[in-house]
Structure formats: C-alpha cells, structure tokens
C-alpha cells in the first residue's frame, strides 16, 4: 500500500506492492502522474502542468487537463478559456465513463484494484462527477442561457454520483464499527481460536465489502427498492442516456458521516492513493455543490427546482475542510475554495451565524486561526504562486488591515498566469478604492481593462469616479488640476456605456453593466436639464457608492470610515452648487451610505434613524426611468443588519455599540431578559429581511440577494438553536 505522501512526490511503492496486479499498478501510476502534473498550476506553473498532462492519455490525465483549464476559466471568466475548459471537461467525462464501464465489467478479474471501501469503477465515476461539476460551473458562467440550463442538469448528475459514493463510505464505516464491536465483545469470553477469528473480521472487511458490492449489483436489477442501490445509481450515469433523476425532488442528502471526517490523511483507511483520491475528491465536490446551492440569491431560486435538492452550508464547509487535509491537487483546490469563501463571501455578507467554539472552531463563523494555518500550509506547498499571495492579501483586508493588503499586491513579481495577474490587479484596485487612493485606484482599474474583458464598463466607470473625486478635491484650490481631472473623469464616464452589455451571465446583462449604463444616462440627462458639465451633474460620491456595494466598510478601520464620512459631506457643502436641485432620491442615497458607515462604526442608533427616514418615504419616489430603484430594498437589509449587530450574543463577540446618546443604551439585567431582548432583535431583523427578499425585481437584486440569502440562513440557524417554549 502507499502512504499519502507518495501522491505528489512519487515515492517508491512499499515492499508488498509486488503482489498487486499490473493493471492496478498502471492505474495508480496514471493517477499519481496526472495529479502531480495538474498540481503544478497551483504553483503558477501552467506550462509544466500542460506538459506533464500531455504525456498520458488516461482518464486521470484527461481530467487533469480539464481541471487546469477550469482553474484558468474561473479565475478570468474569459470566453475562449471557458470554451477550452468545456471541451476538455466533456472529453474527460466521456473518457471516465468508458473506463468506469470497463472497471465494472472486469470487476471479478484478479488484475484489478479492489477497494475495501468503494465499489469497482468508483474512481472513474468520481472523475465524471468532477468533470460534470466543473463543466456546470463553466456553463453557468457562460453567456448562453441554454448552456446555463444544461449546467443545472449536470449538477443533478454529479449530485447523484457523489451521494452514492458517500453512501459507500457510510456503509464501510458501519461495517467497521460492527466488526470492532464483535471483536470487543468476544475477546474476553471465547476460546483463543475464536478470538483470533473475530480479530480477523476487521482486517477482512475489504473482501466483505467487495463481495457485498458485487451481490448488490445483481440484486438491484432483480428487486429494485425505494432506496436505489449505489451500484444502480452509478450505472445510471451513462452519457448516452437521459439525465438521472433523483427519487424525490425534495430528497434529503445522505447524512454526513462524521466518523470518516474525523480521519486524517495518515489514517489506516487511506492507505491506497485511489481511495485517497475518491475520498478527498468526493468531499471536495459535494462540499462545493452544497455550499454553492446554499448561496443562490432569491432572484435565482426558481432554478433550484431544476436541481431538485437544497444546499447545506455547514455540511458543505465541513466536507471542504476535510478535503483540504490531503496533500494532493484536490486538497489544494479545496483550500483555495475555503479561503475564497471566508475572505470573500463571508466578509461580503453582514449577517452571518454566530461563532460556536468547538474542536475545530465553527465552520460558519470566521475561524481566523484555522484559516491562517491553512494559508501558511499552502504558501509553503506552493512558494512560487501569486495565487496564495493574493489570498494572504484578501485575508489581511478581511481583518481590517488594508494597508498590508495593498502592500502585498504592489510587489514587482508577476504571475505567468494571465488570469492570476488580472485578479491581483483587480484586488489592488479595490484596496486602493477602500483607502481612497484615487490615482492608484484609477490606474489599476484601467490596467484591468487590458488584462480582463469581464466588466470593462465597471472598470472605466470607477476610473472616471476616481478622477471625479480628485476634481472635487481641488476644484476650489487648483483650477488647472481640476480641469485635468474633470476631462479624464468625463472621458472614462463616456467610455463606460460603450462597452456595457458585451458580456452576459446566464443570458442576462451583468448587474454592474446595467447600473453603469443607467447612471451615465441619468447624469447626462441632468447635465442637459441643469445646463452644467457632466462632472457637475454627478450626485453623491460614486466611489463611496462603490465602496458600499463591494462592502468595503467591513474592511475599514474607524479612521478610514471617518474619511468616508468626510467624502460624503461634500454633497451638502458649499462647494456643491447643484445640491439644492437634488430630489429625494439622491438625498436618500446620501443617507443610506452614511447609515452604512455608521453601522460599521457601531453607531446603530444614528444609522437606524437615517434608515427610518428613508423607509418612511413613499417608495414610488425611487421608481421610474433612470432612478435608483435599489434604495428601499437595500435600506431594509441595512436595518436588519443593525438589529442583528445589536444582539447581546453579537456584542459579546465583537464588542458593544458606540452610541452618541443614552437611547437604547440600557442592557438586559438577567439572562432571561437578555434572551428575550435578543429574540426580539432577531424577530425584527427577520421582518426586514423578508421584505427585502420578497421585493420586486430591482437593479443589483442578484448581488444584494446573496447577502439576503446568507442573512436568512443565519436567522434560521439562530431560531433552530433558540426554539420558543
């Protein structure tokens, strides 16, 4: 058998390897060679990865080529790379299907590997599931609605395969526990010969499982049951047939097998690299699947009916953490997914479940120490990769150290992967924006235009907004500089709508493309009506608006937040000669942005007062041609976020609110009072969230919907742990 370390470094097989058949050794060698080569992309060595994978033609090599293209596609969202990824993944799926049928057909042959845990051909079924899952993600990112719909059917097929593999693991663990129980109950009261026989029961579990698996394949065809057999599920995944359908659209996934998730890579049950591949791969894929589905915003909820199952964020995260333990390609990709989720999504959302201390911390909070250890491990494994440096920068920003985050991305070293370089520059652009470093921000976003074609209208828009801020800063003190910045601002503002709508997501225009085009049209109409220049027709600081939409406030220190308030104050200053002409819409935007900053400053009373003023107005004031119809639903979410942060449990973890008055300053006197106080806060929070979730279609609803979905899940989790008597 092989230890886990042989996965990447090709250690010599153990002495007993000679007893294995040639075919099983060839399969193992193909797996190790393919995964070793594909792993090079996580160290920014795409040429080495492609060259290594080109040396083989096995299903594992085909999958490796697909994975390499998938990583590049999801990093850059470029159509040509996504097409290449789709083609490679389809080839990998077909190749794995052929090998799966071959393995099942030859399952009785002595020259095949017989896993103690998995049925014959499971490794190739997993290859299909990985290809289907990655192909589905690429399909969703595709501009074609047809491809996007097909993607959801691929998710169904991948789900059924992965669920079947998990059932095999569950069955194996149950048999192992039963064998151990028999051994422990008989060892003290039976003859030594029988004790010896009992002790062999556990060690012979491989043959027992193998035999049962073979019997199940025949039994299922003869007598199908409501709980479709694992073998039948795997057989149903033939590419020539119709998409597999779950028995019940609302079925409950296989319960998570906590026992096997407690096993580290050096456990005795992971002695063969094929089993390691299946276990780590199935946990990674199923974990990603459950996590992604749990994050779907309300506006896309109808698509879930195509899939027929629901996400489970907590379970998905546990499975991803398990996959990240393994020193292979899967472990590296799982680590990247984990870090991206916590430093990206969690820090983007404002209402998340409370942290619960435990053995490994709480997967749904922000396990900072655990994340730091994981990142350090990846930096050690892949020292040449800018990808992990990027993750370190994101982690610094997520923990309110934006200066360090920006510094890490301003080095001289560049990644040979264009997609990683584009991500680095984009993150640098955002950090510069949060820090109000306008010239660096503008230059960086203009650099993004050349590196990535995903949302060029947004890049031009933010570059123009930066020069607008610089124009406003010097308008009254340096007319020459002001004129220069005004010219550049207008130039980039006018370029933005010309490239909007070039990209599609599930056949829909990108949310920010729609936003940018409308904003420009609104300003142009105002400039004509007011007879002023375009830059003087712009309302509330668009950079502060962008900081809000990217949730930059959660990454900023109090000092940086105060700077945002100063920038917002310009609108009502004497320098703004058009403020008296503004209607309730622009004034509501100013109040909303100020409320968001005050919430981040933990001044909830002031924040709620501003929001109440917005919500007290007629909602029709914010609807109509060229208007910002997102104001009211976002104000509802902001109110919910304030209420969530006022709870005693939240305060115990993050500190108390900083109120400027004694209003609402009294704290509950007893534990019972505290629970009632918190329950009331959660109840009100939920009311605002439900209104936001049920709001009619509005601009940026998909983006805001991500936060609303996460928030509703957090509230439901709180309610499940605090049931009413």
UniProtKB/Swiss-Prot annotation:
The lineage of its organism: Eukaryota, Fungi, Dikarya, Ascomycota, Pezizomycotina. Keywords: Cytoplasm, Nucleus, Phosphoprotein. PANTHER family: TETRATRICOPEPTIDE REPEAT PROTEIN 39 FAMILY MEMBER, TETRATRICOPEPTIDE REPEAT PROTEIN 39C. Inclusion body (IB) resident protein that interacts strongly with lipid droplet (LD) proteins. Involved in LD-mediated IB clearing after protein folding stress, probably by enabling access to the IBs of an LD-stored soluble sterol derivative that acts as a chaperone in inclusion clearing. Its main location: cytoplasm. Signal peptide: none annotated. InterPro entries: Iml2/TPR_39 (IPR019412). It is found in: Cytoplasm; Nucleus. The keyword Chloroplast does not apply. GO terms for cellular component: cytosol; mitochondrial outer membrane; nucleus. Interacts with lipid droplet proteins. Residues 187-209 are annotated as: Disordered. This is Inclusion body clearance protein iml2. Belongs to the IML2 family. The gene is iml2.
């Amino acid at each position: 058998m092989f230890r886990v370390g042989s996965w990447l470094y090709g250690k010599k097989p153990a002495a007993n390897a000679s007893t294995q058949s040639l075919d099983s050794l060839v399969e193992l060698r193909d797996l190790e060679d393919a995964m070793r080569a594909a792993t090079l992309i996580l160290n920014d060595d795409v040429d080495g990865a492609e060259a290594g994978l080109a040396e083989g033609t096995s299903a594992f090599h085909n999958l490796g080529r697909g994975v390499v293209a998938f990583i590049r596609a999801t990093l850059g969202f470029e159509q040509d790379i996504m097409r290449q990824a789709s083609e490679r993944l389809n080839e990998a799926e077909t190749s794995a299907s052929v090998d799966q049928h071959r393995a099942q057909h030859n399952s009785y042959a002595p020259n095949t590997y017989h896993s103690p845990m998995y049925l014959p051909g499971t490794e190739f079924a997993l290859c299909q599931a990985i290809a289907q899952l990655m192909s589905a993600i690429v399909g969703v990112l595709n501009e074609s609605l047809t491809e996007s719909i097909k993607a959801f059917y691929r998710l169904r097929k991948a789900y059924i395969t992965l669920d079947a593999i998990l059932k095999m693991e569950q069955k194996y663990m149950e048999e192992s526990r039963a064998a151990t129980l028999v051994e422990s109950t008989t060892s003290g009261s039976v003859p030594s010969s029988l004790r010896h026989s009992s002790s062999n029961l556990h060690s012979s579990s491989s043959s027992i499982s193998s035999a049962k698996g073979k019997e199940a394949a025949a039994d299922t065809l003869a007598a199908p049951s409501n709980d479709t057999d694992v073998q039948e599920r795997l057989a149903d995944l033939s590419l020539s047939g119709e998409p597999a359908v779950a028995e019940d659209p609302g079925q409950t996934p296989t319960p998570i097998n906590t026992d096997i998730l407690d096993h580290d890579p050096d456990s005795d049950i992971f002695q063969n690299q094929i089993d390691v591949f299946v276990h780590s791969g199935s946990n990674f894929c199923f974990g990603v699947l459950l996590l992604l589905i749990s994050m779907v915003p309300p506006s896309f909820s109808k698509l879930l009916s195509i899939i027929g199952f629901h996400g489970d964020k907590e379970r998905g995260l546990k499975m991803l953490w398990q996959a990240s333990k393994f020193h292979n390609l899967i472990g590296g990709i799982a680590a990247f997914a984990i870090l991206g989720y916590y430093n990206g999504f969690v820090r983007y959302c404002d209402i998340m479940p409370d942290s619960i201390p435990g053995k490994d911390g709480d997967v749904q909070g922000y396990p900072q120490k655990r994340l730091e250890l994981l990142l350090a491990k990846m930096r050690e494994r892949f020292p040449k990769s800018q990808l992990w440096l990027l993750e370190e920068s994101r982690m610094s920003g997520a923990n309110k150290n934006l200066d360090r985050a920006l510094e890490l991305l301003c080095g001289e070293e560049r990644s040979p992967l264009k997609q990683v370089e584009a991500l680095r520059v984009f993150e640098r652009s955002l950090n510069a924006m949060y820090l109000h470093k306008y010239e660096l921000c503008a230059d960086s976003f203009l650099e993004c235009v050349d590196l990535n074609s995903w949302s060029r209208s947004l890049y031009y828009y933010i570059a123009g907004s930066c020069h607008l801020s610089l124009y406003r800063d010097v308008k009254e003190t340096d007319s020459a500089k002001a004129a220069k910045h005004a010219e550049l601002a207008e130039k980039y503002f006018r370029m933005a709508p010309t490239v909007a709508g070039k990209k599609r997501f599930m056949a829909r225009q990108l949310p920010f493309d729609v936003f940018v085009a409308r904003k420009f049209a609104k300003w142009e109409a105002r400039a004509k009506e007011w007879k002023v220049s375009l830059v003087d027709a712009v309302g509330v600081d668009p950079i502060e608006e962008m900081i809000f939409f990217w949730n930059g406030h959660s990454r900023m220190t109090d000092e940086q937040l105060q700077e945002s308030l100063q920038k917002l104050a310009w609108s009502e200053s004497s320098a703004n000669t058009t403020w008296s002409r503004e209607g309730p819409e622009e004034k509501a935007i100013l109040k909303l942005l100020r409320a968001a900053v005050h919430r981040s400053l933990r001044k909830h009373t002031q924040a709620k007062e501003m929001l109440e003023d917005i919500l007290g107005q007629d909602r029709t004031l914010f609807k109509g041609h060229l208007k910002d119809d997102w104001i009211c639903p976002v104000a509802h979410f902001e109110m919910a976020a304030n209420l969530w942060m006022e709870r005693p449990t939240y305060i115990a973890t993050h500190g108390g609110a900083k109120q400027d008055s004694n209003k609402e300053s009294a704290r509950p006197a007893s534990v019972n009072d505290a629970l009632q106080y918190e329950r009331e806060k959660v109840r009100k929070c939920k009311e605002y969230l439900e209104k936001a979730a049920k709001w009619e279609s509005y601009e940026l609803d998909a983006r805001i919907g991500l936060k609303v979905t996460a928030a509703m899940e957090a509230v439901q989790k709180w309610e499940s742990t605090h049931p009413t008597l």
